[in-house]
């Protein structure tokens, strides 16, 4: 560019740049002009719909002319509370939403004639005094030339377009996230109250609430969700210009009005108590209703109460972070089972974990002294007669007579984890302790070492931890996966509604209840597994369905399916499945059922009238009710709902109680109290029969594990030698070593031998005084100690009973046990014992 004689000449490049810039500005100005015209058109349409005469004590005079208004000016502070009103003379005014003020709405909006035409391409101010008015959104572009203004002004207009779009939208406080708690779908949808004559877009009574807030001044609001609703429901129209106020921006206001609670919210569209008082009504009931709502929100915020069991569908996973109990229990159970496998390998199937080497019993006397092997598995290899790695074959040592055994491999689980006990050439009768393993489980011998539920060790050695720790162990991969999958499916329903602490307490109570009943009713076997806790979750589904009766789509069907599932699971295991502890299942079911009712939040929704109506309308029970009865039930239920709604609306409800979540109903407290007493009684009786000798000794013949084929039988007694054989038994005989213990045996013959009811010495006894009968009886001990409980009836020798005879015998035994007619064989007298001994000799 060059300058000469006061004139300037543009170069070709500069001229191109200016031309392209001018074309771009013209194109942008046309686009902006079109957007402004569309926004102004929508504003005029909205103002025409909203222009209705106000009602109430604060009626405004009709507009004298299309461009005049006599509405008072409502000025609000930064918190959204009205501070001052000015009633000025009518003056010419047009709609001018302020850029820095929140989006406001009022019933006295200007008419279509008060708005500028679309050709003006600008929104004019509402007052001639620019010093006292808020900043304009758009400058008039009529005097800017054909281009529609400079480039800076065009950019400003483009920036203000979103504000114009927001100005014609509904106020933010009118669209409240309202969770429909009566609908069973549990969805969340933005809800707006209906428009009525004399009310704004946000609901009825906006002018009355506005006037009340003007009188209150800086008084605090009754409801947090109602804060800022007046400034969102009233469009600010400047007055005489005596005072101006800088409003907070809409994003700041929306952030301030963000609700803190995650539960339900209600629209604050009902009139306040002051409105009723001014109109001649009684504001007391409204105060109670408002106090109730405030108390409910306080409880939700303070205690994080879940008011709806089914979270709404939204962005992302609505249940994210809701299943801590599922992941916690599953991970713990898997970790403990892996520890079982590790211990099964390192202890040689539970047979050896000590570094002490015990020489053979036929070794020279000078070499029979046990010794400690400080490193390696040499001690266990010698004691078990195996070798873990290939060694050079050597001849037998003439002094120690020890040669490395055959090469063997250790397994964590499966058939290879089975063993034949201890070698007979090293351990007397070592082969009698044979222990087989299932295809998916470690050797059952390790369960007792890991802390499985063993009633005999709990009573005699005080190992109380077995009552709790036994439910973390599992017998195999199939057992573990089945329990974890069933628990996850049940916790998927319970945990989002009941929360982590309540669900964790339920899981522990169910597991301990199952362990207690199993330990008392079947003390002969070793029990592992968390199926008792799972049945506790199943039992809790019954109070869950009653507690959330109004939120479940088909609660009657849900309750029916839960009942059928429990019966099928319980009775299915009683058909003849071996290795299943039905006592633990039954105890967990009772514990979970009682705990669920003891902690139930409300039984308010479970009324017979509503239940009968649901049953009459269901496809399962409709045939039980005639058509007239079904119609009558439905009408009665609708009348009851309408009556309760009228009572709540009129204020005939009691003030909020302290314990809000329990609703304070006497019937509900009776249910909780009865269930809590039942649970405490159930636990107390079981603990007494588990730990107190005077109680469990009176139960000498517990029922054992039961099924439709009968029961396994269980026989308990004090271990003692047969009278007259105390000095004849060897020093390390099992009877002499364990003398005085109260032990329970599966076989009645074994119990008679160890409890002194039958003689262990007989013709043909070996060096230890053990007869063939005694050795055969000992064959039942490995299965009893290893936790294998074959489902059979304990019968006398030579007795062959059919299935029908077993059922009859089991029924008679149960009948006698219930009536207290169980006969225990009396201990023989000294004369009878002497006579039996002489006859045997």
UniProtKB/Swiss-Prot annotation:
Biased composition (Low complexity): 1-10, 95-132
Keywords assigned by UniProt, alphabetized: Hydrolase, Membrane, Protease, Serine protease, Transmembrane, Transmembrane helix
InterPro entries: Pept_S54_Rhomboid-like_Rom4/5 (IPR017092), Peptidase_S54_rhomboid-like (IPR002610), Peptidase_S54_rhomboid_dom (IPR022764), Rhomboid-like_sf (IPR035952)
Region (Disordered): 1-289
Annotated TM spans: 323-343, 464-484, 492-512, 526-546, 571-590, 673-693
Compositionally biased tracts (Basic and acidic residues): 11-51, 154-163, 209-230, 243-275
Database matches in Pfam families: Rhomboid (PF01694)
Family: Belongs to the peptidase S54 family.
Name of the protein: Rhomboid-like protease 5
Organism: Toxoplasma gondii
């Amino acid at each position: 560019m060059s300058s000469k004689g006061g004139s300037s000449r543009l170069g070709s490049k500069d001229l191109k740049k200016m031309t392209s810039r001018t074309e771009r500005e013209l194109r942008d100005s046309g686009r902006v002009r079109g957007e402004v015209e569309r926004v102004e058109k929508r504003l005029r349409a909205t103002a025409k719909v909203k222009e209705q005469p106000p009602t109430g004590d604060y009626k405004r005079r009709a507009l004298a002319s299309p461009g005049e208004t006599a509405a008072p000016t409502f000025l609000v502070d930064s918190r959204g509370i009205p501070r001052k009103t000015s009633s000025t003379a009518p003056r010419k005014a047009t709609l001018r939403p302020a850029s820095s003020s929140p989006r406001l709405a009022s019933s006295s909006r200007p008419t279509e004639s008060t708005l500028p035409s679309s050709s003006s391409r600008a929104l004019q101010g509402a007052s001639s005094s620019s010093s006292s008015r808020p900043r304009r959104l758009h400058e008039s572009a009529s005097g800017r030339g054909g281009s529609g203004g400079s480039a800076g002004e065009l950019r400003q207009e483009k920036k203000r377009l979103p504000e114009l779009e927001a100005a014609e939208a509904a106020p933010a406080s009118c669209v409240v996230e309202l969770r429909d708690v009566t609908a069973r779908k549990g969805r969340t949808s933005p809800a707006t109250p209906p428009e009525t004559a004399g009310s704004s877009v946000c609901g009825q009574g906006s002018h009355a609430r506005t006037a009340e807030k003007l009188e209150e001044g800086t008084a605090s609001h009754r409801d947090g969700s109602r804060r800022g609703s007046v400034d969102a429901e009233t469009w600010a129209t400047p007055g005489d210009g005596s005072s101006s106020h800088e409003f907070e921006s809409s994003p700041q206001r929306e952030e301030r009005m963000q609700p803190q609670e995650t539960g339900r919210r209600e629209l604050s569209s009902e009139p306040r108590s002051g409105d009723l008082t001014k109109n001649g009504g009684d504001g007391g009931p409204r105060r109670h209703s408002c106090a109730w709502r405030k108390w409910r929100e306080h409880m939700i915020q303070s205690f994080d109460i879940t008011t709806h069991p089914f979270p709404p569908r939204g962005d992302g996973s609505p249940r994210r972070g809701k299943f801590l109990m599922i992941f916690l229990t599953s991970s713990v159970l898997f970790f403990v089972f892996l520890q079982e496998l590790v211990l099964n390998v390192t202890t040689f199937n539970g047979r050896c974990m000590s570094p002490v080497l015990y020489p053979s019993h036929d070794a020279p006397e000078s070499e029979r002294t046990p010794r400690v092997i400080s490193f390696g598995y040499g001690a266990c290899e010698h004691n078990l007669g195996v070798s873990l790695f290939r060694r050079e074959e050597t001849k037998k040592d003439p002094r120690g007579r020890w040669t490395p055994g055959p090469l063997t491999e250790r397994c964590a689980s499966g058939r290879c984890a089975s063993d034949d006990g201890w070698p007979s050439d090293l351990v007397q009768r070592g082969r009698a302790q044979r222990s087989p393993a299932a295809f998916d489980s470690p050797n059952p011998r390790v369960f007792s070492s890991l802390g499985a539920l063993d009633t005999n060790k709990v009573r005699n050695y005080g190992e109380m931890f077995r009552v709790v720790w036994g439910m973390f162990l599992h017998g195999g991969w199939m057992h573990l996966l089945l329990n974890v999958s069933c628990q996850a499916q049940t916790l998927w329903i319970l945990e989002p509604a009941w929360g982590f602490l309540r669900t964790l307490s339920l899981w522990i109570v169910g597991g301990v209840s199952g362990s207690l009943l199993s330990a008392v009713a079947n003390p002969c076997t070793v029990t592992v597994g968390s199926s008792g806790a799972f049945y506790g979750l199943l039992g809790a589904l019954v109070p869950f369905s009653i507690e959330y009766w109004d939120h479940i789509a088909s609660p009657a069907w849900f309750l029916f399916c839960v009942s059928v599932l429990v019966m099928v699971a319980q009775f299915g295991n009683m058909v003849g499945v071996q290795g299943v502890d039905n006592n633990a299942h039954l105890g967990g079911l009772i514990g979970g059922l009682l705990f669920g009712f003891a902690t139930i939040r409300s039984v308010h929704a479970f009324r017979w009238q509503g239940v009968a109506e649901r049953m009459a309308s269901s496809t399962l029970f409709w045939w039980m009710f005639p058509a007239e009865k079904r119609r009558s039930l439905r009408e009665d239920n609708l009348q009851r709902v309408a009556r309760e709604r009228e009572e709540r609306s009129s204020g005939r409800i009691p003030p909020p109680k302290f314990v809000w979540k329990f609703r304070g109903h006497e019937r509900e407290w009776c249910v909780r109290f009865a269930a809590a007493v039942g649970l405490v009684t159930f636990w107390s009786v079981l603990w007494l029969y588990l730990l107190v000798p005077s109680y469990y000794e009176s139960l000498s013949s517990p029922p054992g594990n039961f099924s439709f084929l009968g029961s396994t039988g269980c026989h308990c007694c004090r271990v003692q030698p047969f009278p007259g054989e105390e000095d004849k038994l060897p020093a390390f005989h099992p009877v002499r070593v364990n003398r005085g213990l109260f032990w329970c045996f599966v076989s009645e013959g074994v119990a008679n031998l160890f409890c002194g009811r039958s003689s262990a010495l007989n013709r043909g006894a070996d060096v230890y005084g053990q007869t063939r009968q005694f050795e055969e009886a000992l064959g039942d001990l490995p299965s009893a100690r290893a936790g294998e409980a074959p489902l059979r009836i304990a019968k006398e020798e030579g007795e062959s009973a059919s299935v029908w005879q077993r059922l009859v015998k089991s029924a008679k035994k149960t009948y006698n046990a219930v009536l207290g007619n169980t006969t225990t064989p009396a201990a023989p007298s000294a004369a009878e014992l002497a006579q039996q001994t002489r006859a045997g000799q």
